[in-house]
Amino acid sequence: MKKVIFSVFVGVFVLACGDQSNHIGKPIETQNAISVKEGLKQFHASNKSEEVVIYGKVADVCQTEGCWFAYELSDSTLTVDFNNEFTVPKNIRRKDMYAVGHFFKDTVESSEKDSINLSKSKITVKFRAHGVKFK
């Protein structure tokens, strides 16, 4: 009887360790993925918000909850958020990652107290991911 219980325990343990998924959120098909730079280029050219799979290297990640990360670009970064659908590990900086979702324009109001700048706002492009996959 002890052998049977032990065998069942070992079997369950092996099965639990076997399927370590490398994605979070919506599953991603990576064969049609484009670089972050190419995705931004296409978004600026069409101004359409279509679902796309992008990939790149993570430059930064939220160290509080893992609620956003930023892709490296040559002269800046692209912020990726998840609309509270999931979070990512906090130790993914410098790792390559895929994301499925869409680009969008976000208006950031000026936080300066100067009355000249109060009416000014800055439009930035961000990416809203529905799933991510680690390379």
Protein language model regions, located:
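Sec-dependent bacterial lipoprotein signal peptides
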Residues: 1-15
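OB-fold and OB-like single-stranded nucleic-acid-recognition modules
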Residues: 17-135
